[in-house]
Amino acid sequence: MTIEDRGDAHVITHSLAKHTLSRLRDTTTEQVSFRKGLVKLGRISGYEIIDGAMETEFTAFETPLTETTGERVTGLDDVVIINVLRAATPFVEGLLKAFPRAKQGVISAGRDEDAGMDADGEFPITVDYVKLPDISEGDTVIVADPMLATGSTMCTVLDHVTDEMPAAGVEDLFVLSAVSAPDGLLRVGDQFPDADLLTVAIDDTLTDDGYIVPGLGDAGDRAFRTT
């Protein structure tokens, strides 16, 4: 398992994940390569979740030559992936390569840039659309958004997700990002202590406008070639 415990979060240290993130940060990486990079990062992250959080069991079966036993991952059919529109769309596409039978939910949420960040380092968040599947106690829930900056958007999204969860909770609740800022990790961790925060990188600087530095820019704009 290539995940490092960083106190407030678990950092994916897989070499290919770090390589892919470096490509995403690079301004010379054009739209198609950027989008494909997010897909790849989602798939790697999915495999890391399987390796680090899911159990296996031995099962009997037949090969073309004989009877034998082998390991199979349990819980692959009990995964719920929440796509925070729109930047997470290619990220989630990669997750679905690891969890092809996952149920999917979408939440369209974004911060009010015109209102700006308040004295507590939070943005007002607008939620335009919510569509979530049924969530059961045995489910592994993955809420995916490439950038976790102030944590304002993620906390709002998690409010909606946890409202749909059973009272007893779920098997695992992951908050998955490509790049995170310490302020956002602390905010999400404080408000949702049962969530496992999983990221590929933690960048130290958050600007007064709420952008992560060095970061990778606006993931949605770079993936969809919009400004």
UniProtKB/Swiss-Prot annotation:
Q: What is its EC number?
A: 2.4.2.9
Q: Which GO biological process categories is it annotated with?
A: UMP salvage; uracil salvage
Q: Which domain of life is it from?
A: Archaea
Sites where the protein binds GTP:
36-40
Pfam families per UniProt:
UPRTase
Q: Which UniProt keywords apply?
A: Allosteric enzyme, Glycosyltransferase, GTP-binding, Magnesium, Nucleotide-binding, Transferase
**Cleaved signal peptide residues:** none
Q: How is its activity regulated?
A: Allosterically activated by GTP.
Catalyses: UMP + diphosphate = 5-phospho-alpha-D-ribose 1-diphosphate + uracil
One GO molecular-function annotation for this sequence?
Answer: uracil phosphoribosyltransferase activity
Write down the SUPFAM superfamilies for this protein, in alphabetical order. Answer: PRTase-like
Cofactor: record remark: Binds 1 Mg(2+) ion per subunit. The magnesium is bound as Mg-PRPP.
The keyword Transferase belongs to this UniProt entry's keyword annotation: yes
Spell out the disulfide connections.
Answer: none
| Binding residues annotated for 5-phospho-alpha-D-ribose 1-diphosphate, in chain numbering | 86, 111, 145-153, 218
Q: Which family does it belong to?
A: Belongs to the UPRTase family.
Function according to Swiss-Prot or TrEMBL: Catalyzes the conversion of uracil and 5-phospho-alpha-D-ribose 1-diphosphate (PRPP) to UMP and diphosphate.
NCBIfam families attached to this UniProt entry:
PRK00129.1, upp
Name under which the protein is recorded: Uracil phosphoribosyltransferase
- Its source organism is Halobacterium salinarum (strain ATCC 700922 / JCM 11081 / NRC-1)
